[in-house]
C-alpha cells in the first residue's frame, strides 16, 4: 500500500476560505503540519505503508490562490529535515561529527540552515562530513 499526505491548504474562493475568514476554521501552520508528519510517517512505515508524497505539488495556481494553511513548495524536505534534527536532539548537547550522504546535506542543514543554527543555540557543536558511506536520508553520528 502507498499513501500521500497532503496537509490542508486554504484556497481563495472556497468554502474553507470563507470559514477561515470568519475565524471558524484555523488551519495548521507549516511547522505544525511538519511536526505531525514526523509522528505519522514512522507509524505508516511500521505498518508497511510507503509514503510516496508529502505536501502538495508546487504549482503557480496554488501559489497564487493559497490564503492560509500548510503549503510550502518543499514540505517533504522540511519533514525529512525534522527527522534528522530530531535524531540529533535525542543526544545530549556536546561535540559531534555528523556524517551525511551528499544527497541529504540540505535536509541536515534545514531551510536557510535553521537546523544548524538551532543546534548551535542548544549547545551542539557539530562538524558535518559528507560521505557516500552513509545511506541517503540517514545520519551517522560520532561523539568527538
What label would you give each PLM region?
Residues 60-144:
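Radical SAM enzyme core and accessory elements
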Residues 1-92:
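C-terminal scaffold of the Radical SAM
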Amino acid at each position: 500500500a502507498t499513501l500521500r499526505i497532503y496537509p490542508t491548504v486554504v484556497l481563495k474562493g472556497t468554502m474553507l476560505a470563507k470559514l477561515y475568514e470568519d475565524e471558524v476554521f484555523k488551519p495548521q501552520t507549516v511547522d505544525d503540519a511538519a511536526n505531525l508528519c514526523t509522528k505519522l510517517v514512522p507509524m505508516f512505515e511500521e505498518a508497511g505503508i510507503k509514503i510516496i508524497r508529502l505536501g502538495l505539488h508546487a504549482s503557480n495556481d496554488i501559489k497564487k490562490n493559497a490564503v492560509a494553511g500548510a503549503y510550502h513548495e518543499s514540505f517533504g524536505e522540511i519533514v525529512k529535515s525534522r527527522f534528522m534534527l530530531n535524531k540529533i536532539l535525542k543526544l545530549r548537547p556536546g561535540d559531534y561529527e555528523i556524517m551525511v550522504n551528499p544527497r541529504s546535506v540540505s535536509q541536515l542543514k534545514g531551510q536557510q540552515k535553521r537546523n544548524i543554527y538551532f543546534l548551535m543555540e542548544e549547545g551542539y557543536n557539530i562538524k558535518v562530513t559528507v560521505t557516500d558511506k552513509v545511506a541517503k536520508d540517514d545520519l551517522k553520528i560520532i561523539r568527538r
